[in-house]
């Protein structure tokens, strides 16, 4: 469903080269890698994965889920029906909305490996590879070095949490770049607005928006999740009362974080000792006291855009002190996966959420808003035609509260 005034979502046909290539080449390659990484899968699972791979690459007709008893089956049936209504024809992998196609492809993969029965993460071998990388732990140590002030710690951690996206298991170009950052890679930096808001909300007047909870919509596990947890620790120590980390209910997009990934990385932090173990100890204490929560929901695996939230989740986010949206796929979900003019104000596009919003995103797909001017996008096109999709550039974008009707005053 598209909100009035929004451009139409990107499609998987040849109207968008990157989306079309994703379905023809990138996703089939990921399925091949999944088969290779799980050599002990029974032949029946490998056959189902190979069939799915072939159907996606060839642009075959999209079928409904075979198991109607799964908890999300009716939602996906409705999503497929909507694609059929939009097309007035049978949906194929190469003629539907891209966000639907990608999310549904991973849902079909989960069905093919019988995840609902086994709970076995088909992407675990790849996730463990990054978790065992010394680069991850060096990055975490560097990001959590002592600073002169809470504000400086937050400023540093927000930047590290953004650029940790460059180590993303489904995106080879980002892996090649590692964590090396050029100054002009950060296209928008609104950390100043964020820090001013957080300082005001924690100030002597005690006037602030929301209920004192930050919702962090997580993206990838590994380096990014480690930095999400470090940022949560900093916020809980210096600014906020509670942090809720929103997670995927089942594995998807290769590296997206689930509750199992959180506990796996906490165990690895503890085993590493030193500052990582101390961080894990604090995080476990926050969790025990319910200041830190992990909230998996099938919504985050769905093809729904962010304005199409379940009511219970919408109500929670709308009264949050801050909503942090992480990563490229969540950015696409927030924008409607469509091609706004790149200089469209971020606050205008996100005005459907009442709460203040922070987006941390490295660009790995075409949608982008909030650039300083139309000339910024034109200049980037001249110097780097792949600037929207190659994972090199990033955004730190902040929107203040949209509605003042929920302003909360707490007696000092």
Give, region by region, the residue ranges found by the protein language model.
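Short, flexible loop/turn elements at secondary-structure junctions
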Residues: 107, 218-222, 298, 361-364
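Histidine-anchored nucleotide/phosphate-binding helix
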Residues: 223-245
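C-terminal functional extensions of proteins
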Residues: 2-4, 11, 247-249, 255-412
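Structural motif
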Residues: 213-215, 321-322
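Non-catalytic accessory regions outside enzyme or core folds
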Residues: 1-211, 397-411
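Short amphipathic alpha-helices and their capping/turn segments at secondary-structure boundaries
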Residues: 194-197, 234, 311-318
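Residues at the starts of beta-strands that form the adenosine-phosphate
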Residues: 213, 241-244, 356
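Gly/Ser/Thr-rich loops at beta-strand to alpha-helix junctions
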Residues: 96-100, 218-226, 250-252, 328-333
